[in-house]
A protein has these predicted regions:
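Intrinsically disordered, low-complexity Ser/Thr- and acidic-rich flexible linkers and loops
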Residues: 23-30, 75-80
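Alpha-helix boundary/N-cap detector
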Residues: 7, 30-33, 85-92
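Short amphipathic alpha-helical interaction segments
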Residues: 47-63
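Short alpha-helical segments that sit at the start of domains
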Residues: 1-27
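Short helix-coil junctions and helix-kink-helix linkers
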Residues: 34-51
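Short, amphipathic alpha-helical interaction segments positioned at domain boundaries
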Residues: 83-111
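A short, conserved structural fragment
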Residues: 61-75
Length: 111
């Protein structure tokens, strides 16, 4: 049986994976910056808000280690309080989780 938590992790990891080797970029606070488009579109499409997505990324990074996270200082004019840009990249354990989850989806579909 697939758990809701696993589905949430899977969808978030797939978002990061879709951004390739450059990783998924975001700030602490929502922004209209072009690099934030993937996160904002994902939030809108999944019926979640930006803060929820950012929290999920941080929880996955801290609790399961499926994501690497680094931060860089944002020197853009619109940075304001959100002066750091976080870059999330998929780790090997994250790729492994995606494979296991997709295998479980196939097995459940066969039942």
């Amino acid at each position: 049986m697939i758990k809701l938590k696993d589905k949430l992790i899977y969808e978030t990891l797939k978002l990061v994976e879709s951004q390739g080797k450059g990783g998924l970029l975001c700030r602490n606070k929502q922004s209209d910056a072009e690099f934030m488009r993937p996160v904002n579109e994902f939030a809108a499409a999944s019926g979640r808000n930006y803060t929820s997505i950012k929290s999920t990324l941080d929880i996955i990074h801290k609790n399961w280690g499926y994501l690497q996270r680094e931060s860089i200082k944002d020197t853009g004019l619109d940075a304001g309080k959100a002066s750091k840009i976080f870059i999330y990249r998929l780790c090997e354990s994250g790729r492994s989780f995606i494979k296991k989850y997709e295998k479980a989806l196939v097995q459940n579909a066969d039942k």
